[in-house]
Amino acid sequence: MSYASEVKKELTSLEVHEKNAKAELMALIRMNGAIGINNRQLTLNTQTENPAIARRIYSLLKEFYHLEAELSVRRKMKLKKNNLYIVRLRTGVKELLNDLSILKDDFQINEKVPEGLLTEESELRSYLRGAFLASGSVNNPETSRYHLEIYSLYESHNQMIADWINKYNLNARTTERRSGYIVYLKEAEHIADFLQLIGATNSMLKFEDVRIMRDMRNSVNRLVNCETANLNKVANASMKQINNIQFIDETVGLGELPPKLREVAEARLIHREVSLKELGELVPGGPISKSGINHRLRKINQYAEKLRA
């Protein structure tokens, strides 16, 4: 089961009060429902690839609207051949759609929730939960870049969802996608907060655990890379020093160096892998500070370059 499926499974197990059930259904049916006419009667088909969501819709209709829907399943034949679960309602459709403010009196669809309809925070959260169940997705935090999105057919509805999410300072952004629009979150902290907001507490905790481990691994990797780079830098500098000292020795002899440079050159040939600080403590005339050792080694390098010129 994917992480997104785990989140949705948790959400479909939540108990809700009547007003919140209405808000959740308002999103589920507005975003996944299709109105039809059969024998001069309105019908409503709500489709999903997730059986838990289909059961959720069926249960909410029965418990809070006392409507008996039909559950059916068929196999999609295009692209991914997943099962498609259909919740079909043949009676009470117009009354339901009117109560959910989805259908206007002239049988036009309300593209978004009318202003002032959902006034309580619990209702807003429930609508966002329904919207995520209907057409939301979230990447697995273990294997992917952080990303959560909700798809909407209508731009006005998409912007409404973004505005509601941003009431909680989650930096939701919008963009056009295929034949519709999406609102999305990219920051890990905001995704975790959104999961908590819609009631997916266990999924949020799992997300946070994975995020913390990823951040720790990334920090360790950065430290290791930095340390490796520093070691390589030191090793390369040491090799250059040794090559120059050997060149001087083979060309004119180390005795041609001033005494202070000669003692550092001889110490470096003997102690090739030590740091500058350690080398300063090993020089016979020492101890010499790290900056002092570095200064003398630069002089030795310059002497070698003059010999090569």
Curated annotation (Swiss-Prot):
Pfam families: HTH_WhiA (PF02650), LAGLIDADG_WhiA (PF14527), WhiA_N (PF10298). Residues 275-309 bind DNA. One of its GO terms (molecular function) is DNA binding. It comes from the Bacteria. Involved in cell division and chromosome segregation. Belongs to the WhiA family. This is Probable cell division protein WhiA. PANTHER family: CELL DIVISION PROTEIN WHIA-RELATED (PTHR37307:SF1).
